[in-house]
Amino acid sequence: MSKNSYCYQINLQFFASKKGVGSTKNGRDSHSKRLGAKKADGQMIRVGQIIYRQRGTKIFAGQNVAMGSDNTLFALSDGIVRFQKFGSKQSKTRVNIIKHQLNA
């Protein structure tokens, strides 16, 4: 090397300008199933209308009420919905339809 020549060594380091983003296992949810009472005690109901949607037998079928394959309770006749407690400690609930002619 000559007297006037200089040797420079450049050491460049590049740093991340943005943090590396990872994925998450959260952030999703299932759609609600809209379970529960569709008709209240004392309401008028028509044949085939749903009274109660449920998983399992929380409410039992009484007179003029049938249970579908998914445990949904529905009316077998026109009338008025009546919920009734029964069992040894009144711990179970049954729904009945009191037959009543509805005006069309």
UniProtKB/Swiss-Prot annotation:
InterPro entries: Ribosomal_bL27, Ribosomal_bL27_CS. GO terms for molecular function: structural constituent of ribosome. Residues 1-15 form a propeptide. The N-terminus is cleaved by ribosomal processing cysteine protease Prp. It holds the Pfam family Ribosomal_L27. One of its GO terms (cellular component) is cytosolic large ribosomal subunit. Belongs to the bacterial ribosomal protein bL27 family. This is Large ribosomal subunit protein bL27. It comes from Mycoplasma genitalium (strain ATCC 33530 / DSM 19775 / NCTC 10195 / G37). The lineage of its organism: Bacteria, Bacillati, Mycoplasmatota, Mycoplasmoidales, Mycoplasmoidaceae.
